[in-house]
């Protein structure tokens, strides 16, 4: 992996497993588009409480040459799947990949 990756945990305990998963997702993005300049990811748990459990929100900022940053905010809304941090990460990076594909076209 050559792209610098900044990972921030907000209201979430640091997890090596989460960092590994994010870095794996970044490698997949690099395989598609090798000109990424940097990636910033914020994993957070909003302070509001839900009846069934806490959900996670993942924000990703991809810095690309010659264009505005690609920003993805995956707010869980009513999606209870985002009670699993790894599902929230997967969904956020899937959205980032789609936006990156649009940028390349």
Range-by-range predicted roles:
Residues 1-105:
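N-terminal, polar/charged subdomain of small-to-medium soluble alpha/beta proteins
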């Amino acid at each position: 992996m050559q792209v610098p990756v900044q990972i921030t945990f907000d209201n979430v305990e640091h997890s090596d497993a989460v960092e590994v998963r994010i870095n794996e997702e970044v490698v997949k993005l690099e395989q598609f588009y090798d000109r990424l300049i940097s990636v910033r990811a914020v994993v957070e748990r909003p302070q509001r409480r839900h009846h069934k459990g806490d959900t996670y929100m993942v924000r990703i900022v991809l810095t690309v040459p010659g264009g505005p940053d690609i920003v993805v905010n995956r707010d869980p809304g009513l999606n209870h799947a985002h009670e699993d941090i790894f599902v929230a990460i997967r969904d956020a990076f899937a959205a980032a990949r789609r936006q990156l594909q649009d940028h390349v076209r």
